[in-house]
C-alpha cells in the first residue's frame, strides 16, 4: 500500500482524474494500491443521491457533481481527506459493507488517540460524536467502487471553518450538526494527525 501526502490543496477535478487513472492501474496490476491524504480548495460536491433542494445556495463555492455515493458535502481547508484506492478482490474477508465499517473503525480509533469518543453510524453513514448533548458529524464518507477497486473515501474535519457548510444541508441531514477536532478542543496540525491515521489504518486493515 502506497501513501501519498500532499502539502498544498489539490484541485477537485485534478483529484478525480488522478483517482480514475489510478483505479485502472490497480485493476491492471500496473500500480499499487494507494491512500492519498490531501485537502481541497473550498467547494461543494453532490453525490449520486443528492437532491437539488439540499443545495441552499450555489454562490458561495463551486459545486461539483461526482459519482460517489451520498448527498451534498463540503470540502475545504482544515479538512483532511483520505482517498483510499484498494482492491477488494485481493481481500478474501472484505466486502463492500465490511469495507465501509472498517473505514469507520479506522477513523474512530484515530480520534480515540486524541481523546475524542466517537462512533460509526451505519444508518447515517459517517463518524459521529456527542457534543454538549447533541449528535454531530465529524467525518463524512463517500465511496465508489469500480472493478472492485475502491476510490473516493473519508473527510475528517480537523480545523475546518464550519460556517462553510451553510450553503448545503450536509449529507441531507437537517436534524444534526457538524463539528471538528478544533471545536472539540483538539488543536493539531495535519502532520500529527496523518501519523496517527497511517498507524491506525495499518492496524485495522492488516487482516482484511
Curated annotation (Swiss-Prot):
Keyword Secreted: no
Keyword Acyltransferase in annotation: yes
Name of the gene encoding the protein in the UniProt record: lipB
This protein's UniProt keywords: Acyltransferase, Cytoplasm, Transferase
Name of the molecule in the record: Octanoyltransferase
Biological processes per GO annotation: protein modification process
Pfam hit, one: LplA-B_cat
Chain sites annotated for binding substrate: 68-75, 140-142, 153-155
UniProt-listed SUPFAM superfamilies: Class II aaRS and biotin synthetases
Domain BPL/LPL catalytic stretches: 29-208
PROSITE patterns the record matches: BPL_LPL_CATALYTIC, LIPB
GO terms of molecular function: lipoyl(octanoyl) transferase activity
Record field: transmembrane: none
Note: In the reaction, the free carboxyl group of octanoic acid is attached via an amide linkage to the epsilon-amino group of a specific lysine residue of lipoyl domains of lipoate-dependent enzymes.
Domain of life: Bacteria
UniProt-annotated catalytic positions: 171 (acyl-thioester intermediate)
Role summary: Catalyzes the transfer of endogenously produced octanoic acid from octanoyl-acyl-carrier-protein onto the lipoyl domains of lipoate-dependent enzymes. Lipoyl-ACP can also act as a substrate although octanoyl-ACP is likely to be the physiological substrate.
Positions of the record's site feature: Lowers pKa of active site Cys: 137
Family: Belongs to the LipB family.
Subcellular localization: Cytoplasm
Biological pathway: Protein modification; protein lipoylation via endogenous pathway; protein N(6)-(lipoyl)lysine from octanoyl-[acyl-carrier-protein]: step 1/2
EC number: 2.3.1.181
NCBIfam families: lipB (TIGR00214), PRK14341.1 (NF010921)
Amino acid at each position: 500500500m502506497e501513501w501519498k501526502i500532499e502539502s498544498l490543496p489539490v484541485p477537485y477535478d485534478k483529484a478525480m482524474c488522478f483517482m480514475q487513472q489510478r483505479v485502472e492501474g490497480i485493476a491492471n496490476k500496473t500500480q499499487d494500491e494507494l491512500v492519498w491524504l490531501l485537502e481541497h480548495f473550498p467547494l461543494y460536491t453532490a453525490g449520486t443521491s443528492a437532491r437539488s433542494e439540499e443545495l441552499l445556495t450555489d454562490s458561495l463555492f463551486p459545486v461539483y457533481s461526482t459519482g460517489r455515493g451520498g448527498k451534498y458535502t463540503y470540502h475545504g481547508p482544515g479538512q483532511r481527506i483520505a482517498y483510499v484506492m484498494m482492491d477488494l478482490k485481493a481481500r478474501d474477508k472484505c466486502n463492500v459493507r465490511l469495507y465501509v465499517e472498517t473505514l469507520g473503525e479506522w477513523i474512530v480509533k484515530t480520534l480515540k488517540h486524541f481523546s475524542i469518543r466517537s462512533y460509526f453510524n451505519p444508518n447515517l453513514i459517517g463518524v459521529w460524536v456527542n457534543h454538549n448533548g447533541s449528535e454531530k458529524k465529524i467525518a463524512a464518507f463517500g465511496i465508489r467502487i469500480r472493478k472492485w477497486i475502491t476510490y473516493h473515501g473519508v473527510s475528517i474535519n480537523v480545523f475546518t471553518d464550519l460556517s462553510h457548510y451553510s450553503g448545503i444541508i450536509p449529507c441531507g441531514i437537517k436534524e444534526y450538526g457538524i463539528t471538528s477536532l478544533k471545536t472539540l478542543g483538539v488543536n493539531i496540525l495535519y502532520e500529527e494527525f496523518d501519523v496517527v491515521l497511517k498507524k491506525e489504518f495499518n492496524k485495522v486493515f492488516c487482516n482484511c
